[in-house]
Amino acid sequence: MRTNPTTSGPAVSTLDEKNLGRIAQIIGPVLDVVFPPGKMPNIYNALVVKGRDTVGQQINVTCEVQQLLGNNRVRAVAMSATDGLTRGMEVIDTGAPLSVPVGGATLGRIFNVLGEPVDNLGPVDTRTTSPIHRSGPAFIQLDTKFSIFETGIKVVDLLAPYRRGGKIGLFGGAGVGKTVLIMELINNIAKAHGGVSVFGGVGERTREGNDLYMEMKESGVINEKNIAESKVALVYGQMNEPPGARMRVGLTALTMAEYFRDVNEQDVLLFIDNIFRFVQAGSEVSALLGRMPSAVGYQPTLSTEMGSLQERITSTKEGSITSIQAVYVPADDLTDPAPATTFAHLDATTVLSRGLAAKGIYPAVDPLDSTSTMLQPGIVGEEHYETAQKVKQTLQRYKELQDIIAILGLDELSEEDRLTVARARKIERFLSQPFFVAEVFTGSPGKYVGLAETVRGFQLILSGELDSLPEQAFYLVGNIDEATAKAMNLEGEKK
Protein backbone atom coordinates (compact mmCIF):
# COMPACT_ATOMS: atom_id res chain seq x y z
CA MET A 1 0.00 0.00 0.00
CA ARG A 2 1.38 3.41 -0.81
CA THR A 3 0.21 6.99 -1.02
CA ASN A 4 0.64 8.92 -4.24
CA PRO A 5 1.64 12.60 -4.31
CA THR A 6 -1.39 14.82 -4.76
CA THR A 7 0.02 16.78 -7.70
CA SER A 8 1.38 15.36 -10.90
CA GLY A 9 4.53 17.55 -10.77
CA PRO A 10 6.67 15.51 -8.34
CA ALA A 11 5.48 12.24 -9.93
CA VAL A 12 6.75 13.35 -13.34
CA SER A 13 10.11 14.54 -12.01
CA THR A 14 10.74 11.17 -10.33
CA LEU A 15 10.32 9.46 -13.71
CA ASP A 16 13.37 11.38 -14.97
CA GLU A 17 15.50 9.55 -12.40
CA LYS A 18 14.25 6.10 -13.47
CA ASN A 19 16.02 3.67 -15.79
CA LEU A 20 15.58 4.50 -19.45
CA GLY A 21 15.60 1.79 -22.10
CA ARG A 22 14.85 1.57 -25.81
CA ILE A 23 12.51 -0.67 -27.80
CA ALA A 24 14.53 -3.27 -29.74
CA GLN A 25 11.71 -5.42 -31.13
CA ILE A 26 7.91 -5.37 -31.39
CA ILE A 27 5.90 -8.55 -32.03
CA GLY A 28 2.21 -7.73 -31.65
CA PRO A 29 1.58 -6.95 -27.97
CA VAL A 30 5.07 -8.12 -26.93
CA LEU A 31 8.01 -5.69 -26.70
CA ASP A 32 11.72 -6.40 -26.28
CA VAL A 33 13.47 -3.52 -24.51
CA VAL A 34 17.22 -2.93 -24.10
CA PHE A 35 18.41 -1.30 -20.84
CA PRO A 36 21.88 -0.04 -19.85
CA PRO A 37 24.10 -2.71 -18.18
CA GLY A 38 23.33 -3.16 -14.46
CA LYS A 39 20.02 -1.29 -14.68
CA MET A 40 17.67 -4.13 -15.53
CA PRO A 41 14.06 -3.86 -14.27
CA ASN A 42 12.60 -6.61 -12.10
CA ILE A 43 10.03 -9.15 -13.29
CA TYR A 44 6.49 -7.62 -13.13
CA ASN A 45 7.82 -4.04 -13.14
CA ALA A 46 5.67 -1.62 -15.12
CA LEU A 47 7.33 0.03 -18.12
CA VAL A 48 5.89 3.14 -19.77
CA VAL A 49 6.37 4.11 -23.43
CA LYS A 50 5.57 7.76 -24.15
CA GLY A 51 5.98 9.64 -27.40
CA ARG A 52 4.26 10.41 -30.68
CA ASP A 53 3.50 8.20 -33.65
CA THR A 54 4.19 9.03 -37.30
CA VAL A 55 1.08 11.23 -37.60
CA GLY A 56 1.79 13.10 -34.36
CA GLN A 57 -0.74 11.29 -32.14
CA GLN A 58 0.20 11.00 -28.45
CA ILE A 59 1.24 7.49 -27.38
CA ASN A 60 1.12 6.26 -23.78
CA VAL A 61 1.51 2.49 -23.47
CA THR A 62 2.10 0.63 -20.19
CA CYS A 63 3.78 -2.79 -20.30
CA GLU A 64 4.67 -5.42 -17.73
CA VAL A 65 8.06 -7.18 -17.64
CA GLN A 66 7.62 -10.94 -18.09
CA GLN A 67 11.09 -12.27 -18.94
CA LEU A 68 14.75 -11.25 -18.57
CA LEU A 69 16.38 -12.47 -21.80
CA GLY A 70 20.06 -11.72 -21.16
CA ASN A 71 22.23 -9.23 -23.09
CA ASN A 72 20.48 -6.44 -21.13
CA ARG A 73 17.15 -7.26 -22.80
CA VAL A 74 13.75 -7.73 -21.19
CA ARG A 75 10.53 -8.97 -22.76
CA ALA A 76 7.34 -7.17 -21.73
CA VAL A 77 3.64 -7.55 -22.51
CA ALA A 78 1.65 -4.42 -23.39
CA MET A 79 -1.57 -3.59 -21.51
CA SER A 80 -2.99 -1.63 -24.45
CA ALA A 81 -2.64 -1.60 -28.24
CA THR A 82 0.93 -1.20 -29.55
CA ASP A 83 -0.15 0.69 -32.71
CA GLY A 84 2.28 3.46 -33.61
CA LEU A 85 5.22 2.16 -31.55
CA THR A 86 8.58 2.02 -33.35
CA ARG A 87 11.99 0.54 -32.60
CA GLY A 88 14.27 2.93 -30.77
CA MET A 89 11.47 4.64 -28.78
CA GLU A 90 12.31 5.52 -25.19
CA VAL A 91 10.94 3.28 -22.41
CA ILE A 92 10.75 4.32 -18.75
CA ASP A 93 11.08 1.73 -15.97
CA THR A 94 8.73 2.86 -13.18
CA GLY A 95 10.64 0.68 -10.69
CA ALA A 96 7.45 -0.92 -9.31
CA PRO A 97 4.60 -3.22 -10.41
CA LEU A 98 1.34 -1.82 -11.79
CA SER A 99 -0.50 0.01 -9.01
CA VAL A 100 -4.21 0.79 -8.92
CA PRO A 101 -6.39 3.09 -6.77
CA VAL A 102 -8.08 1.42 -3.79
CA GLY A 103 -10.55 2.40 -1.07
CA GLY A 104 -14.03 3.89 -0.86
CA ALA A 105 -13.42 6.30 -3.74
CA THR A 106 -13.44 3.37 -6.18
CA LEU A 107 -17.12 2.56 -5.47
CA GLY A 108 -19.53 3.43 -8.26
CA ARG A 109 -16.71 3.86 -10.78
CA ILE A 110 -15.51 1.86 -13.81
CA PHE A 111 -11.78 1.18 -14.22
CA ASN A 112 -9.52 -0.44 -16.78
CA VAL A 113 -6.66 -2.81 -15.96
CA LEU A 114 -4.33 0.12 -15.09
CA GLY A 115 -6.80 1.51 -12.55
CA GLU A 116 -7.68 4.46 -14.80
CA PRO A 117 -11.36 5.52 -14.66
CA VAL A 118 -13.12 5.00 -18.00
CA ASP A 119 -16.60 6.35 -17.11
CA ASN A 120 -15.96 10.05 -17.96
CA LEU A 121 -16.67 11.08 -14.35
CA GLY A 122 -13.27 12.68 -13.76
CA PRO A 123 -10.28 11.49 -11.72
CA VAL A 124 -10.65 9.20 -8.69
CA ASP A 125 -10.53 11.05 -5.40
CA THR A 126 -7.96 8.88 -3.62
CA ARG A 127 -4.25 9.10 -2.89
CA THR A 128 -3.96 5.45 -1.89
CA THR A 129 -2.82 2.89 -4.45
CA SER A 130 -1.79 -0.73 -4.18
CA PRO A 131 0.37 -2.99 -6.42
CA ILE A 132 -1.58 -5.72 -8.24
CA HIS A 133 1.09 -8.37 -7.52
CA ARG A 134 1.35 -9.63 -3.96
CA SER A 135 1.41 -12.96 -2.20
CA GLY A 136 -1.67 -14.46 -0.53
CA PRO A 137 -2.26 -13.98 3.21
CA ALA A 138 0.17 -15.81 5.50
CA PHE A 139 -0.97 -19.15 6.90
CA ILE A 140 -1.30 -17.70 10.41
CA GLN A 141 -3.61 -14.88 9.18
CA LEU A 142 -6.19 -17.23 7.69
CA ASP A 143 -9.56 -17.75 9.32
CA THR A 144 -10.08 -21.51 9.31
CA LYS A 145 -13.56 -21.55 10.86
CA PHE A 146 -16.27 -22.91 8.58
CA SER A 147 -19.04 -20.37 8.44
CA ILE A 148 -21.98 -19.95 6.09
CA PHE A 149 -22.24 -16.79 4.03
CA GLU A 150 -25.95 -15.96 4.21
CA THR A 151 -27.21 -14.50 0.93
CA GLY A 152 -30.91 -14.11 1.77
CA ILE A 153 -31.72 -16.17 -1.36
CA LYS A 154 -33.65 -19.28 -0.26
CA VAL A 155 -32.51 -21.77 -2.89
CA VAL A 156 -28.84 -20.89 -2.38
CA ASP A 157 -28.87 -20.81 1.43
CA LEU A 158 -30.78 -24.08 1.79
CA LEU A 159 -29.38 -26.38 -0.92
CA ALA A 160 -25.96 -25.07 -1.95
CA PRO A 161 -24.83 -22.63 0.77
CA TYR A 162 -21.86 -20.36 0.13
CA ARG A 163 -18.85 -20.43 2.39
CA ARG A 164 -17.68 -17.16 3.93
CA GLY A 165 -14.43 -16.52 2.10
CA GLY A 166 -15.18 -19.34 -0.33
CA LYS A 167 -15.26 -19.59 -4.09
CA ILE A 168 -18.41 -20.31 -6.03
CA GLY A 169 -18.73 -21.27 -9.69
CA LEU A 170 -21.77 -19.83 -11.48
CA PHE A 171 -22.76 -21.88 -14.52
CA GLY A 172 -25.38 -20.59 -16.90
CA GLY A 173 -26.04 -19.76 -20.53
CA ALA A 174 -27.35 -16.50 -21.96
CA GLY A 175 -30.68 -15.19 -20.70
CA VAL A 176 -31.20 -17.40 -17.64
CA GLY A 177 -30.63 -14.64 -15.08
CA LYS A 178 -26.90 -14.65 -14.24
CA THR A 179 -26.72 -10.85 -14.25
CA VAL A 180 -29.83 -10.41 -12.09
CA LEU A 181 -28.54 -13.00 -9.59
CA ILE A 182 -25.18 -11.20 -9.48
CA MET A 183 -26.88 -7.84 -8.86
CA GLU A 184 -29.12 -9.28 -6.13
CA LEU A 185 -26.08 -10.73 -4.34
CA ILE A 186 -24.33 -7.34 -4.58
CA ASN A 187 -27.44 -5.66 -3.12
CA ASN A 188 -27.92 -8.23 -0.33
CA ILE A 189 -24.31 -8.23 0.88
CA ALA A 190 -24.50 -4.45 1.18
CA LYS A 191 -27.75 -4.57 3.20
CA ALA A 192 -27.15 -7.59 5.42
CA HIS A 193 -23.38 -7.56 5.88
CA GLY A 194 -22.52 -3.88 5.39
CA GLY A 195 -20.15 -5.14 2.73
CA VAL A 196 -19.14 -3.99 -0.70
CA SER A 197 -18.58 -5.72 -4.01
CA VAL A 198 -16.03 -5.60 -6.80
CA PHE A 199 -16.96 -6.79 -10.29
CA GLY A 200 -14.15 -7.93 -12.59
CA GLY A 201 -15.23 -8.20 -16.22
CA VAL A 202 -12.50 -10.43 -17.65
CA GLY A 203 -12.61 -10.71 -21.44
CA GLU A 204 -16.35 -10.09 -21.58
CA ARG A 205 -18.38 -8.38 -24.29
CA THR A 206 -18.30 -4.59 -24.15
CA ARG A 207 -22.09 -4.55 -24.65
CA GLU A 208 -22.61 -6.81 -21.61
CA GLY A 209 -20.37 -4.58 -19.49
CA ASN A 210 -22.36 -1.54 -20.54
CA ASP A 211 -25.70 -3.31 -19.91
CA LEU A 212 -24.55 -4.32 -16.42
CA TYR A 213 -23.53 -0.74 -15.61
CA MET A 214 -26.88 0.65 -16.83
CA GLU A 215 -28.87 -1.99 -14.91
CA MET A 216 -26.88 -1.29 -11.74
CA LYS A 217 -27.70 2.40 -12.05
CA GLU A 218 -31.40 1.61 -12.58
CA SER A 219 -31.58 -0.72 -9.59
CA GLY A 220 -29.68 1.61 -7.24
CA VAL A 221 -26.61 -0.61 -6.75
CA ILE A 222 -24.72 2.34 -8.26
CA ASN A 223 -26.08 5.61 -6.87
CA GLU A 224 -25.72 8.26 -9.60
CA LYS A 225 -26.77 11.16 -7.37
CA ASN A 226 -24.32 10.25 -4.61
CA ILE A 227 -21.55 8.05 -6.01
CA ALA A 228 -20.05 7.51 -2.52
CA GLU A 229 -23.16 5.53 -1.52
CA SER A 230 -22.67 3.00 -4.33
CA LYS A 231 -22.07 -0.61 -3.36
CA VAL A 232 -19.80 -1.82 -6.17
CA ALA A 233 -16.61 -0.99 -8.06
CA LEU A 234 -16.37 -2.20 -11.67
CA VAL A 235 -13.14 -3.24 -13.42
CA TYR A 236 -13.34 -4.09 -17.11
CA GLY A 237 -10.89 -5.71 -19.52
CA GLN A 238 -13.03 -6.42 -22.56
CA MET A 239 -12.70 -8.92 -25.40
CA ASN A 240 -11.22 -6.32 -27.76
CA GLU A 241 -8.25 -5.59 -25.49
CA PRO A 242 -4.79 -7.17 -25.79
CA PRO A 243 -4.21 -10.45 -23.90
CA GLY A 244 -1.98 -8.68 -21.34
CA ALA A 245 -4.89 -6.53 -20.16
CA ARG A 246 -7.31 -9.48 -20.01
CA MET A 247 -4.77 -11.54 -18.07
CA ARG A 248 -4.22 -8.85 -15.42
CA VAL A 249 -7.69 -7.29 -15.02
CA GLY A 250 -8.69 -10.06 -12.57
CA LEU A 251 -5.73 -9.08 -10.36
CA THR A 252 -6.74 -5.40 -10.53
CA ALA A 253 -10.25 -6.25 -9.27
CA LEU A 254 -8.81 -8.57 -6.60
CA THR A 255 -6.42 -5.85 -5.36
CA MET A 256 -9.36 -3.45 -4.83
CA ALA A 257 -11.25 -6.21 -2.97
CA GLU A 258 -8.22 -7.01 -0.76
CA TYR A 259 -8.07 -3.40 0.45
CA PHE A 260 -11.70 -3.54 1.63
CA ARG A 261 -10.93 -6.83 3.42
CA ASP A 262 -7.56 -5.98 5.00
CA VAL A 263 -7.81 -2.24 5.73
CA ASN A 264 -11.56 -1.59 6.05
CA GLU A 265 -12.10 -5.06 7.60
CA GLN A 266 -15.25 -5.68 5.56
CA ASP A 267 -16.88 -8.70 3.94
CA VAL A 268 -16.32 -8.33 0.21
CA LEU A 269 -18.00 -10.05 -2.71
CA LEU A 270 -15.72 -10.45 -5.76
CA PHE A 271 -17.31 -11.33 -9.09
CA ILE A 272 -15.17 -12.60 -11.95
CA ASP A 273 -16.92 -12.91 -15.29
CA ASN A 274 -15.49 -14.99 -16.89
CA ILE A 275 -12.70 -17.01 -15.25
CA PHE A 276 -12.20 -19.00 -18.47
CA ARG A 277 -11.19 -15.78 -20.27
CA PHE A 278 -8.45 -15.28 -17.66
CA VAL A 279 -7.00 -18.68 -18.60
CA GLN A 280 -7.49 -17.96 -22.31
CA ALA A 281 -5.57 -14.66 -22.06
CA GLY A 282 -2.78 -16.42 -20.15
CA SER A 283 -2.60 -18.98 -22.94
CA GLU A 284 -2.21 -16.22 -25.58
CA VAL A 285 0.52 -14.48 -23.58
CA SER A 286 2.32 -17.78 -23.01
CA ALA A 287 2.43 -18.46 -26.76
CA LEU A 288 3.66 -14.91 -27.48
CA LEU A 289 6.47 -15.39 -24.94
CA GLY A 290 7.55 -18.56 -26.74
CA ARG A 291 6.71 -21.09 -24.03
CA MET A 292 6.08 -24.70 -25.05
CA PRO A 293 2.31 -25.36 -24.99
CA SER A 294 0.91 -27.99 -22.64
CA ALA A 295 -2.27 -30.13 -22.87
CA VAL A 296 -4.85 -28.92 -25.46
CA GLY A 297 -2.57 -25.97 -26.29
CA TYR A 298 -2.87 -24.33 -22.85
CA GLN A 299 0.06 -22.67 -21.11
CA PRO A 300 2.40 -24.94 -19.11
CA THR A 301 1.93 -22.56 -16.13
CA LEU A 302 -1.89 -22.96 -16.06
CA SER A 303 -2.13 -24.35 -12.50
CA THR A 304 0.37 -21.80 -11.15
CA GLU A 305 -1.46 -18.83 -12.70
CA MET A 306 -4.84 -20.04 -11.47
CA GLY A 307 -3.43 -20.76 -8.00
CA SER A 308 -1.79 -17.33 -7.67
CA LEU A 309 -5.17 -15.67 -8.32
CA GLN A 310 -7.35 -18.06 -6.32
CA GLU A 311 -5.12 -18.31 -3.23
CA ARG A 312 -5.47 -14.55 -2.63
CA ILE A 313 -9.27 -14.97 -2.46
CA THR A 314 -9.76 -16.08 1.13
CA SER A 315 -10.96 -15.24 4.65
CA THR A 316 -8.58 -13.67 7.12
CA LYS A 317 -9.16 -12.70 10.74
CA GLU A 318 -9.94 -9.14 9.51
CA GLY A 319 -12.58 -9.87 6.88
CA SER A 320 -13.41 -12.08 3.95
CA ILE A 321 -13.45 -12.13 0.17
CA THR A 322 -16.17 -14.40 -1.14
CA SER A 323 -15.76 -14.93 -4.85
CA ILE A 324 -18.42 -15.80 -7.40
CA GLN A 325 -16.92 -16.79 -10.72
CA ALA A 326 -18.81 -17.36 -13.94
CA VAL A 327 -17.33 -20.42 -15.61
CA TYR A 328 -17.55 -20.98 -19.36
CA VAL A 329 -17.15 -24.66 -20.26
CA PRO A 330 -15.72 -24.96 -23.79
CA ALA A 331 -17.77 -27.37 -25.94
CA ASP A 332 -19.50 -28.54 -22.71
CA ASP A 333 -16.37 -30.57 -21.92
CA LEU A 334 -15.85 -30.54 -18.15
CA THR A 335 -12.52 -32.38 -18.56
CA ASP A 336 -11.02 -29.47 -20.53
CA PRO A 337 -7.93 -28.24 -18.57
CA ALA A 338 -9.38 -24.72 -18.00
CA PRO A 339 -12.63 -25.68 -16.18
CA ALA A 340 -10.96 -28.75 -14.62
CA THR A 341 -8.30 -26.51 -13.00
CA THR A 342 -11.02 -24.09 -11.82
CA PHE A 343 -13.08 -26.88 -10.20
CA ALA A 344 -10.17 -27.75 -7.91
CA HIS A 345 -10.59 -24.34 -6.21
CA LEU A 346 -14.40 -24.15 -5.91
CA ASP A 347 -16.35 -24.68 -2.66
CA ALA A 348 -19.79 -24.55 -4.28
CA THR A 349 -21.43 -24.55 -7.69
CA THR A 350 -24.63 -22.68 -8.58
CA VAL A 351 -26.12 -24.03 -11.81
CA LEU A 352 -28.77 -21.98 -13.59
CA SER A 353 -31.36 -23.95 -15.54
CA ARG A 354 -33.03 -22.80 -18.76
CA GLY A 355 -35.96 -25.14 -18.00
CA LEU A 356 -36.74 -23.35 -14.72
CA ALA A 357 -36.36 -19.92 -16.37
CA ALA A 358 -38.85 -21.02 -19.04
CA LYS A 359 -41.33 -21.96 -16.25
CA GLY A 360 -40.95 -18.45 -14.83
CA ILE A 361 -39.22 -19.65 -11.66
CA TYR A 362 -36.62 -17.05 -10.71
CA PRO A 363 -33.89 -17.30 -9.53
CA ALA A 364 -33.60 -20.20 -12.01
CA VAL A 365 -31.11 -22.10 -9.82
CA ASP A 366 -31.24 -25.85 -10.45
CA PRO A 367 -31.76 -27.37 -6.97
CA LEU A 368 -30.47 -30.83 -7.96
CA ASP A 369 -27.41 -29.83 -10.01
CA SER A 370 -26.10 -27.14 -7.63
CA THR A 371 -23.65 -28.43 -5.01
CA SER A 372 -21.74 -27.19 -1.97
CA THR A 373 -19.03 -28.62 0.27
CA MET A 374 -20.68 -26.72 3.15
CA LEU A 375 -23.81 -28.89 3.16
CA GLN A 376 -22.63 -31.16 5.97
CA PRO A 377 -24.38 -31.72 9.32
CA GLY A 378 -21.22 -30.71 11.20
CA ILE A 379 -21.22 -27.27 9.52
CA VAL A 380 -24.83 -26.27 8.82
CA GLY A 381 -26.37 -28.30 11.66
CA GLU A 382 -28.47 -31.46 11.65
CA GLU A 383 -31.80 -29.68 11.14
CA HIS A 384 -30.69 -27.72 8.04
CA TYR A 385 -28.93 -30.76 6.56
CA GLU A 386 -31.94 -33.08 7.02
CA THR A 387 -34.33 -30.49 5.53
CA ALA A 388 -32.09 -29.95 2.49
CA GLN A 389 -31.74 -33.70 1.88
CA LYS A 390 -35.53 -34.24 2.13
CA VAL A 391 -36.16 -31.34 -0.29
CA LYS A 392 -33.70 -32.87 -2.77
CA GLN A 393 -35.24 -36.35 -2.39
CA THR A 394 -38.75 -34.96 -3.00
CA LEU A 395 -37.62 -33.02 -6.10
CA GLN A 396 -35.66 -36.03 -7.41
CA ARG A 397 -38.72 -38.29 -7.05
CA TYR A 398 -40.85 -35.68 -8.87
CA LYS A 399 -38.28 -35.63 -11.68
CA GLU A 400 -38.44 -39.45 -11.96
CA LEU A 401 -42.27 -39.37 -12.09
CA GLN A 402 -42.48 -36.67 -14.78
CA ASP A 403 -42.29 -39.17 -17.67
CA ILE A 404 -45.14 -41.22 -16.19
CA ILE A 405 -47.21 -38.05 -15.63
CA ALA A 406 -46.58 -36.92 -19.23
CA ILE A 407 -47.79 -40.27 -20.64
CA LEU A 408 -50.51 -41.42 -18.21
CA GLY A 409 -51.43 -38.31 -16.23
CA LEU A 410 -51.50 -37.65 -12.47
CA ASP A 411 -54.50 -39.91 -11.85
CA GLU A 412 -52.50 -43.07 -12.57
CA LEU A 413 -50.05 -42.38 -9.72
CA SER A 414 -50.34 -43.96 -6.27
CA GLU A 415 -51.68 -41.83 -3.41
CA GLU A 416 -48.17 -41.50 -1.96
CA ASP A 417 -46.66 -40.39 -5.28
CA ARG A 418 -49.45 -37.85 -5.84
CA LEU A 419 -48.68 -36.34 -2.44
CA THR A 420 -44.95 -36.23 -3.31
CA VAL A 421 -45.73 -34.46 -6.61
CA ALA A 422 -47.99 -31.91 -4.88
CA ARG A 423 -45.31 -31.12 -2.28
CA ALA A 424 -42.54 -31.02 -4.90
CA ARG A 425 -44.50 -28.48 -6.96
CA LYS A 426 -44.98 -26.34 -3.83
CA ILE A 427 -41.25 -26.63 -3.03
CA GLU A 428 -40.32 -25.71 -6.62
CA ARG A 429 -42.46 -22.57 -6.42
CA PHE A 430 -41.29 -21.71 -2.90
CA LEU A 431 -37.67 -21.80 -4.16
CA SER A 432 -38.54 -18.71 -6.25
CA GLN A 433 -38.52 -15.29 -4.63
CA PRO A 434 -38.91 -11.63 -5.63
CA PHE A 435 -35.60 -9.74 -5.96
CA PHE A 436 -34.88 -6.20 -4.78
CA VAL A 437 -33.07 -5.37 -8.02
CA ALA A 438 -36.03 -6.62 -10.09
CA GLU A 439 -38.58 -4.38 -8.31
CA VAL A 440 -38.42 -1.83 -11.13
CA PHE A 441 -39.46 -4.53 -13.63
CA THR A 442 -41.91 -6.67 -11.62
CA GLY A 443 -43.52 -4.11 -9.34
CA SER A 444 -43.37 -6.54 -6.39
CA PRO A 445 -41.08 -5.62 -3.49
CA GLY A 446 -37.91 -7.68 -3.01
CA LYS A 447 -37.53 -10.10 -0.09
CA TYR A 448 -34.49 -11.06 1.99
CA VAL A 449 -35.13 -14.38 3.76
CA GLY A 450 -32.93 -15.36 6.71
CA LEU A 451 -31.53 -18.89 6.90
CA ALA A 452 -33.62 -19.94 9.93
CA GLU A 453 -36.81 -18.71 8.21
CA THR A 454 -35.87 -20.60 5.03
CA VAL A 455 -35.35 -23.90 6.89
CA ARG A 456 -38.61 -23.43 8.86
CA GLY A 457 -40.58 -22.81 5.67
CA PHE A 458 -39.41 -25.96 3.90
CA GLN A 459 -39.93 -28.05 7.05
CA LEU A 460 -43.58 -26.96 7.13
CA ILE A 461 -44.10 -27.93 3.47
CA LEU A 462 -42.41 -31.33 3.97
CA SER A 463 -44.37 -32.05 7.18
CA GLY A 464 -47.66 -31.87 5.26
CA GLU A 465 -49.10 -29.04 7.37
CA LEU A 466 -49.60 -26.91 4.25
CA ASP A 467 -50.93 -29.63 1.91
CA SER A 468 -54.32 -27.91 1.74
CA LEU A 469 -52.90 -24.62 0.38
CA PRO A 470 -52.90 -23.97 -3.40
CA GLU A 471 -49.46 -24.19 -5.04
CA GLN A 472 -49.68 -20.69 -6.57
CA ALA A 473 -49.61 -19.29 -3.00
CA PHE A 474 -45.94 -20.34 -2.77
CA TYR A 475 -44.85 -18.59 -5.99
CA LEU A 476 -42.66 -15.49 -5.67
CA VAL A 477 -43.02 -14.94 -1.92
CA GLY A 478 -40.47 -14.40 0.85
CA ASN A 479 -40.97 -16.53 3.98
CA ILE A 480 -43.64 -19.16 4.63
CA ASP A 481 -45.92 -16.75 6.52
CA GLU A 482 -46.30 -14.71 3.33
CA ALA A 483 -47.29 -17.89 1.48
CA THR A 484 -50.07 -18.67 4.00
CA ALA A 485 -51.27 -15.04 3.87
CA LYS A 486 -51.29 -15.19 0.05
CA ALA A 487 -53.32 -18.43 0.22
CA MET A 488 -55.93 -16.71 2.42
CA ASN A 489 -56.13 -13.81 -0.06
CA LEU A 490 -56.64 -16.27 -2.93
CA GLU A 491 -59.42 -17.97 -0.94
CA GLY A 492 -61.03 -14.59 -0.28
CA GLU A 493 -60.92 -13.70 -3.99
CA LYS A 494 -62.65 -16.97 -4.92
CA LYS A 495 -65.52 -16.22 -2.53
UniProtKB/Swiss-Prot annotation:
GO terms for cellular component: chloroplast thylakoid membrane; mitochondrion; proton-transporting ATP synthase complex. It catalyses: ATP + H2O + 4 H(+)(in) = ADP + phosphate + 5 H(+)(out). SMART domains: AAA. GO terms for molecular function: ATP binding; ATP hydrolysis activity; proton-transporting ATP synthase activity, rotational mechanism. Keywords: ATP synthesis, ATP-binding, CF(1), Chloroplast, Hydrogen ion transport, Ion transport, Membrane, Nucleotide-binding, Plastid, Thylakoid, Translocase, Transport. One of its GO terms (biological process) is proton motive force-driven mitochondrial ATP synthesis. Its EC number is 7.1.2.2. It comes from the Eukaryota. It is a peripheral membrane protein. ATP binds at residues 172-179. Pfam families: ATP-synt_ab, ATP-synt_ab_N, ATP-synt_VA_C. The keyword Zinc-finger does not apply. The keyword Zinc-finger does not apply. InterPro entries: AAA+_ATPase (IPR003593), ATP-synt_VA_C (IPR055190), ATP_synth_F1_bsu (IPR005722), ATPase_a/bsu_AS (IPR020003), ATPase_alpha/beta_chains (IPR050053), ATPase_F1/V1/A1_a/bsu_N (IPR004100), ATPase_F1/V1/A1_a/bsu_N_sf (IPR036121), ATPase_F1/V1/A1_a/bsu_nucl-bd (IPR000194). It is found in: Plastid, Chloroplast thylakoid membrane. PROSITE patterns: ATPASE_ALPHA_BETA. F-type ATPases have 2 components, CF(1) - the catalytic core - and CF(0) - the membrane proton channel. CF(1) has five subunits: alpha(3), beta(3), gamma(1), delta(1), epsilon(1). CF(0) has four main subunits: a(1), b(1), b'(1) and c(9-12). PANTHER family: ATP SYNTHASE (PTHR15184), ATP SYNTHASE SUBUNIT BETA, MITOCHONDRIAL (PTHR15184:SF71). Produces ATP from ADP in the presence of a proton gradient across the membrane. The catalytic sites are hosted primarily by the beta subunits. Belongs to the ATPase alpha/beta chains family. This is ATP synthase subunit beta, chloroplastic. It comes from Convallaria majalis. The gene is atpB.
